[in-house]
Every structure is written in C-alpha cells, then in structure tokens.
C-alpha cells in the first residue's frame, strides 16, 4: 500500500503544475469555444478524472489524497463557472437528452464505475456526477452540438481507450484532429485505471 501511496503522490505532484497551467490559460481567454479549445478542455477533464480514479481505487481511506482530488475538481468547477460555459443547468435535461444517446459500451463503462465498492461520499464524486456535470457544463444547449460533443469529448470523459476513440468514436474527418489533441501529453486513461490491479 505504501508503494501505491507513493505512486499517487508522484502522479498528483507531476500533474498538478500542468493542470494549474491549463487553468491559467483558460482563464485568459475572453470566451471558450468548444471546437477551438477542446484540447485544453479534454486535457483538463482527463487530468481531473485520473486524479479522481487514483484516489478512489487505491487510496479511498486517505483523507489527504481525497482533499487534493477535491481541490482539483474545485478548480475545474471554478473555470467552468467563471468562463460562463455552464449553458445547461438541469440534470433532468441531460438524463433525457444526452444519456439515451450513449452507446451500450458507454453505458457499460458507467456501470463499471458505479458498482465499485466505495463509500457513499466518494461514490458520489466518482459515479455519474463528474461525467454528467462535466458534460452538462461543456455542452452548449443546441441539439446540433450534442452528437459532435459526444464523439469528440464524451468518449474521453467516459474512459474509452484511445484506440477505441480513434477507431469507433470519432468521424474519420476528425481523427487527425483528435490525434493532435492526444499528442499534447494526455496518456491513455487505462494506464491509470489499471494501476491498482498491478501486483
């Protein structure tokens, strides 16, 4: 367990400066464009998601690590609120309009996260809340935007592996764009989700 704790500390210390830099860059923008700034947004989301999964899966009893994760998510909330891209405020709207559009694979992934043996407080942080809230804040309230967001951003949020994202989740004409986003330093989410399973 000490080894895993050390790994978590190293991971969070390594990622936090990059996260802070992304936050600063986003705050300098007069407004956020879902298309233009999606690289920063996806990196920000994945960094928060990686920190969250590490804390939940490996160190659920460590208050220190949980507080770091909460600080990371609080910064994300601050950016989204201050930049006024929280165009959707109604969770019921998301349930009705966005969730039914998810593929079976995406639903299965959500179920995997939901059914982990977690305390109530951490479970609320992990399952559904981060994903729905992030989608809710990132999606503009226009029906024509929903499918593009689901393909370009939603697949990353739901933890789909990089190769699945490129092969199945993104229109062919957008694949080079997504490869460019991923080349900014975002690693495959599975590397972190599976860390706790290694002996």
Predicted regions and their residues:
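Eukaryotic intrinsically disordered, low-complexity tracts enriched in Ser/Pro/Thr/Gly and charged residues
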Residues: 1-18, 22-25, 29, 198-199
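Short acidic DE-rich linear segments
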Residues: 3, 180-199
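Generic structural signal for well-ordered, non-transmembrane alpha-helical segments
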Residues: 13, 42, 46-49, 53-56, ...
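Short, charge-rich amphipathic alpha-helices with coiled-coil/heptad character
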Residues: 16-57
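Intrinsically disordered, low-complexity coil/linker segments enriched for acidic/polar
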Residues: 37, 87-89, 119, 171, ...
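Extended alpha-helical coiled-coil "stalk/arm" regions
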Residues: 58-108
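Charged, alpha-helical coiled-coil and adjacent rod-like segments in eukaryotic scaffold subunits
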Residues: 100-103, 108-181
